[in-house]
């Protein structure tokens, strides 16, 4: 099969070009020099997104990649051949970055700079970047091997990754535009790239901390880098951890004990009992990010072995929408016991034995299953036409569920259903239709905004998971921190700031350990910075005073990704509300959005603001006090992230807008809001106005005190 990119003749079974690494079966895009323009899809996104035009603060992972000794290569090649090599090289880079929804935002002559987490925030930006780096390493190894075989040239690429906060914005005008990131995070990623050996990828400590649970890393040491005050610890990215999914990570971290959720667990146990009795059940566990949905489901699944049930699980990663049928394939691998890295012959034997034990009638389905799991015999092509494959797979899944549940009770678990793609969701619907009168429980979890059509069946139940009550949150923090008296006030502060969200609490505690604020008592082993929380946390003590809790990057990325999924209007309204404060009056919000040139120049009608607030309430960002009429952020950290994601200039405009709105809406009682007006002018660095309104507030207090003094 000939590659449309470089013209190389490949084997018929090849999925990627053995010369340039480009995916086969894809029509080639019109030739263009990718270094001269912003990609069309990104330009459209930026031009229609006010935040992208004005700029935002985002948590991202930056990836740099370039050709090692590119000048030597260029000197040894004809200019036309060198251009052709670069064309193939950049196509490989683009494919690898876009595969994991990254953005190639700069071409550096012989390499690229890519962003993961901008312009669209991703909660797993560091994992995506590492997956992309490993994918590129393999594709470029093939590319380099072919170049060495045909031309005798040594071709090697090095990559560097770093994670942190950057300012992302448009540079230039609408006709010639670049979208880029600026900040210390970017420069450090480039420095780390220069430390990488040929055909390898290095990550800085910030990235390593975010991905250590999911990837194999080899520590290279701490290096003094230009522009960095302290040596930076650097790691080589070696590969993804075998048999290590998000579910495995949650399970490993859950060994500290299960806190609360007794009522919710009781509902799940009731559904399991009904399924075991032959009344198939589908249960959806719904809740906001980090609230403990997966942990609750795993607590139920611990009972499967004891109840004699066969169990299979799948996780939908955040990039699952770009991978066809991913959760369905994961369910099949889990059900048949297929392990990563095992020989394909072993996998085929496992599947054949399992299916034929259920029914000899499954013999005709073996080629389909082998093809789906990419373990078919290369000498015996079995791929059926695409228009036949989907119906055949649907029929196979229905038969499999019925046959397996007849042999033994079947429990299927799909984690993070909100990330599933339409094809996978449709096939999950086929399973749902088939399990009604079987001994099958399908357990899924998802975020509140998700809906699937198959949730209309009569045997579907939904369990809502809310924030932990204060008593349970206190118990969780005692498990994480201990009960040393020095941590009493800190534990209360963590509980208040994290709002009963278990994941947020765990990440804040780990961040405090990493920064040396919490330390083990004398004689106990100190938790390792950047590592997962210890299985049984030793009693921790307060090692240094703390005035304010910072938001861990993991939590910030998760909340920022959720904000970015909002419609633009709703996101802008939420950001404006965040400037007002954790609690805000809709009238003040309406005034600044309707009358002030705030939020990138946007103005909104009263109707538009009301609609936005209703939608933000529906998706659990805010709550409305029906008695007082005020609104409040449901979670304190959401307000902090929505506030912190805005540039200082944008926040300043909004603070001035709030101050003016308070003056307009409280013209008859200015003394009562004088201190609040002063606060907003001060936050905008309007020093003169801030002092004037503070004097007015002080004068009011003085008058009140004098009145009390002279009261008979």
PLM segments and residue spans:
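Conserved adenine-nucleotide phosphate-binding loops and their immediately adjacent elements
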Residues: 29-47, 174, 228-270, 369, ...
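Short secondary-structure boundary elements
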Residues: 195, 204, 229-257, 284-291, ...
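Phosphate-binding active sites in nucleotide-utilizing proteins
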Residues: 79-80, 86, 92-102, 256, ...
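Sensor-1/coupling segment of RecA-like P-loop NTPase cores
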Residues: 427-464
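Catalytic NTP-binding/metal-coordinating core of nucleotidyl cyclase/transferase enzymes
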Residues: 37-40, 49-141, 179, 282
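A short beta-strand->alpha-helix segment at the C-terminal rim
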Residues: 24, 138-167, 191-224
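Regulatory cytosolic signal-relay segments
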Residues: 4-58, 81-84
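Conserved Walker-type P-loop NTP-binding/catalytic site
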Residues: 324-414, 439, 455-458, 463, ...
